[in-house]
Structures are given as structure tokens and as C-alpha cells.
Amino acid sequence: MPLAALPPELAGLRIVHLSDFHLGIPSRGAVAVERAIEWARRVAPDLVVVTGDLLSRPRAEPRLRELLGSLRPCYVVLGNHDVEHARDPFSRSAGLSDLSPARLLVDEAETLELRGRRVQLVGVDPRSYRTGRSRPWLLADPTAELRILLCHYPTVLRRLPADSFHVVLAGHMHDGQITLPLPLPRRRVLLAHPRAAYASGLYVRNGISMHVSPGLGTTFVPLRFYARPEATELVLERGRR
């Protein structure tokens, strides 16, 4: 992920981005989550970030805590399925709050030192985002040399003032989950979120770089088609955006 004005010390910084576990409902996604966590432990990145929709049923909360507790340092935000804003009739909110030792950010910020530089993480709560009350740029610290916003919804990118953050990490979209390939290069019909502007991958807007995770789990139906689950390692580089 190339970033303009990235301090030399932060070049090569590795961030593992995970999203949309949807644990609690039997599916191949649960296996993907287990494998992704094992892989993340093995690659030992500088930072692990999880961008919401952790559970589809509360019964998986103990296992979720075990998985997140094995990742250090780990920062988390909630998604709509975690706070009862899901249309999936099989989903039930677990009312998650504290996830220690993982750090859950609920409309709050935390600054840490990585490689001798100040890195700020700001987390958006899905409840305030959906009601339009969220103003994450007001939490941004202009003295931080790298500002990272965590939000379940990738559409947050449209709301951000230019250059308020360097990086946005989001999920929610499942890369369509079930898609139909078209006889054109890199073209598909996304059955989930068919008009999505940000389905998965890298985007740039107003000087801000965003990665949208395809996620690992599933909702409504326990399968994916032409929308593979993914755990992503992002490596920051100096360069033009």
C-alpha cells in the first residue's frame, strides 16, 4: 500500500487486516477464520486489525475471545451484526463490549509507538455511523505520523475530509459473497450489494487510501461463489497515492 509522505521508519510496516468472521453459524467461513488466525500468528505482523461482524450468534463468543487473544497487538471495531442492525434472520447480537487483551475501539482513538513513530488508530462504532452522528476526523491527531481509521462500512471514505487520515480499513461487503462472472475482464455481478462502489481491494479518495477486506465468513447462506474469503497482509510503502 503506497502512501505519500510515509516516514522512512514506517516503510515496510506490516498490517494484517481481517474482517467479517460471522462466527456462531456452521459454515466454511468458520474454518477460514481459524486458518486466518493461525496464519496471522505465524507471519507476526506489526499490527492486526479486525473490522467488524465478529459474531452471528452469541454462542461463539468464547471462541472469538480465544482467537483474538492470540493476536498481539490487535485492534477491533464492531460491525452491524454485532449490534443488532442485521437483516439476516439467522443472526443474533452478542452485545460485545470488552474484548481484552484485544483493544475494542468504540468511537475512540488510541496512539501507539511503532518503530519509533506515533501511529494513531481511530475506531468508528456502527451505531453512531448509521445514525450520522459519527465524526471520526474530530478524533484525528495531526501530530501522529500515521493515522489509521477502522470502520466496518467502506462508505465512510465519502464522509472524510481530505487528508484527515492516511489509511482506512473496512469490511462489510464480503466482495459480494455470491457473484456471477461476466464474459468481460474482471467484471462480475455482485448479488450482495450489487451497486457497491467499494466491493473489495484498494481505493483512493481525497488523499486517503482505503483497503476493503473481502472478509472470511458468510451471512444469509453459508457459502461463497466467485468471492473467496481473504486474510490480507498490507505492507506500507513510500510513494505516490
Where are these regions (language model features)?
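N-terminal signal-anchor transmembrane helix
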Residues: 1-45, 60-62
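Conserved beta-sheet core of the metallophosphoesterase superfamily
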Residues: 154-235
